[in-house]
């Protein structure tokens, strides 16, 4: 019997029934956000302008986009921007077999950013800022069930057949930052932000098929099961450095974001894969197989990549047009979790097999790698009435997922589909405050993929159809305490 922990299947010679389950050599972003660096933007105005604010951000979200601009912000202010409502939808047609769709539709409400400015030194060229922002947030929940009896199957030999697929992937990443900017001259500024970050992810996949068949007046029970779960948390430090320059009607900016420096982190991982037959005839059970293990409080390592960004903005008293691009470098393969693997294996002969020992030794490993990504965004704003401004934005959000020998596509939010973001809204400004309201839409072009699993009987699906989209409402409020020097 050949065991393949990427894809397990068995075919019954006496009946054209294929039971197959796709499993991964390591457990699973989330929603797509886990592989997408531009899934979140910050500040209502910046979000609705496609995040294209490296060159011309003029509110306290500069602590994230470009701390080199902080020295030019004269209004110390407290800003609270939130995704009041967001719906994320992932659809995989035939994802669990022919006519067995996998769908997830989740509502989220969470703070996008809370940020403020502080003038510690009056009439100084220094400006200080602080922030708390949601860097990543994702939630996918999918399940599918299939059941049939002997009469419904069209074959009197089959007594019953049951299949199930349950998938949960939740991600939460929070960044806490303090930043400082210095106005070197009336045109040139520099700044830096230090972020302390928390990242937590919880993933669970349960996939099984069960069959009871009557053969020659005896019942034969067959089952295949995949059960795997990961839960981890990581704490890091990340630095961002920024430069800004103004020349006439143009603003330019550039930033560098350092790779993360791990402080500490831990996680749990458990897995089970089995193919079991129970029968009065020993020959039916010769291919039985079971492997399982569980590890807790293991060292967990997650890495954020080095990135560089540049942006330019053209501005007039009533109009802004901005463009930004950011390049994220590759991260070489590394282990999110790499516990010593000493699983229970049956038959025990597999433990001593040269063919299967490497697979068994790496059974609990969770490997990650990211490919380089270049994202770009464009934003436009125009005052259309007294203090009322329309905002428009668009941006790319390409996937960084890279398949490796021990990678788990499911842990990474279904792999490598790209996302495109569109946004529009309005901002209304008063002397001491401003309010911004807008809408966002994100989508992934549909693509054909192999089915993630097969939990039903009948003709097998050759391919599945993956698509996703997201709707959001952005509400921003900024209160200006006083201008510098007032």
What are these regions (language model features)?
Residues 1-36, 482-486:
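Cleavable N-terminal export/targeting peptides
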Residues 1-2, 19, 23, 87-93, ...:
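Short regulatory "switch" loops immediately downstream of catalytic or recognition motifs
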Residues 21, 101-106, 166-169:
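Short secondary-structure transition/capping motifs
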Residues 28-134, 260, 415-417, 443:
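N-terminal, post-signal peptide beta-strand-biased segments of exported outer-membrane/organellar beta-barrel
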Residues 33-47, 111, 117-486:
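Outer-membrane beta-barrel porins/channels
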């Amino acid at each position: 019997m050949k065991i393949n922990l990427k894809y397990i299947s068995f075919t019954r010679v006496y009946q054209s029934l294929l039971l197959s389950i796709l499993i991964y050599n390591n457990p699973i972003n989330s929603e797509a956000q886990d592989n997408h660096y531009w899934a979140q933007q910050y500040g209502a105005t910046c979000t609705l302008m496609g995040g294209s604010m490296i060159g011309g951000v003029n509110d306290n979200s500069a602590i994230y986009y470009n701390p080199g601009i902080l020295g030019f912000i004269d209004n110390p202010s407290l800003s609270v921007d939130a995704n009041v409502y967001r719906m994320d939808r992932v659809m995989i047609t035939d994802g669990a077999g022919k006519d067995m769709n996998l769908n997830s539709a989740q509502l989220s409400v969470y703070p996008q950013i809370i940020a403020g400015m502080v003038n510690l030194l009056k009439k100084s060229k220094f400006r200080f800022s602080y922030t708390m922002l949601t860097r990543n947030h994702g939630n996918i929940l999918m399940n599918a069930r299939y059941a049939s009896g002997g009469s419904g199957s069209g074959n009197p030999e089959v007594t019953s057949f049951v299949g199930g697929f349950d998938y949960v992937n939740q991600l939460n990443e929070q960044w806490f930052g303090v930043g400082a900017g210095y106005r070197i001259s009336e045109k040139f500024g520099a700044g830096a932000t230090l972020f302390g970050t928390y990242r937590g992810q919880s993933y669970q996949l349960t996939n099984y098929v069960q069959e009871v068949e009557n053969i020659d007046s005896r019942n034969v029970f067959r089952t295949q099961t995949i059960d795997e779960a990961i839960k981890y948390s990581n704490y890091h430090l990340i630095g961002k450095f920024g430069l800004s320059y103004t020349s006439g009607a143009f603003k330019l900016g550039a930033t560098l974001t350092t790779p993360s420096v791990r402080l500490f982190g831990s996680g749990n991982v458990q897995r089970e894969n089995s193919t079991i037959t129970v029968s009065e005839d020993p020959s039916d059970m010769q291919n039985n197989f079971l492997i399982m293990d569980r590890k807790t409080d293991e060292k967990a390592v997650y890495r954020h990549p080095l990135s560089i960004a540049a942006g330019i903005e053209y501005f007039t008293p009533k109009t802004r047009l901005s463009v930004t691009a950011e390049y994220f470098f590759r991260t070489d393969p590394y282990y999110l979790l790499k516990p010593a693997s000493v699983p229970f294996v049956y038959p025990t002969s597999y433990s001593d097999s040269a063919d299967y020992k490497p697979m068994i030794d790496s059974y609990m490993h969770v490997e990650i790698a990211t490919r380089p990504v270049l994202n770009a965004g464009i934003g436009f704003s125009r005052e259309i009435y007294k203090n009322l401004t329309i905002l428009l934005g668009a941006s790319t959000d390409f996937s960084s997922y890279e398949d490796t020998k021990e990678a788990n596509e499911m842990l990474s939010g279904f792999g490598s589909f790209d996302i495109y973001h569109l946004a529009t809204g309005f901002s209304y400004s008063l002397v001491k405050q401003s309010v911004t309201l807008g809408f966002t839409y994100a989508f992934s072009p549909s693509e054909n993929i192999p089915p993630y699993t097969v939990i039903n009987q009948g003709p097998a699906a050759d391919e599945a159809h993956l698509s996703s989209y997201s709707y959001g409402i952005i509400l921003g409020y900024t209160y200006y305490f006083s201008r510098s020097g007032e």
